[in-house]
Amino acid sequence: MEDRVNEAIEERKSGNTVESIRILKELIDEYPESGSLHYQCAWSHDASGLEEEAVEYYEKALTYGLDEEESIGAYTGLGSTYRALGKYEKSKEVLEDGLKRHRDRGLSVFYSMTLYNLGETKKAMELLLGQLCDTSSDESIQSYAAAINYYSRDLDRTW
């Protein structure tokens, strides 16, 4: 099975998502409760621009169980897919659930985008600015990190 999964991943990486999906669906027929196969199939659907179809596979992947790395990817993928489909509340719900389970910066950034779409711009900016301060090695950002973090908590405040 591992060789076939690797083949499907390589097909996806080379842009042949149709073949990747075909291989993964065959494997899912053999191993219908494999969270990892459902996750890979969801990813290949997403890479094909088939977001609606990806949702079912992401949901099954999370239901059947994944290792930590794949779980983070599935929460990110599903939350991002819901956002791309305009299902912002569902996106928020999925990403919040993912963030309860995993401390992951990528999840947090996608969550910020969803908050923006929901009009929760203050919270979105606070999260993004915090990520910027925490991850940037740029000296000019780091020299102002304390101020950026302080101001990010209430961007509308004036003195």
Report residues per predicted region.
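TPR/TPR-like (Sel1-like) alpha-helical repeat modules
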Residues: A61-T63, R103, Y116-E139, N149
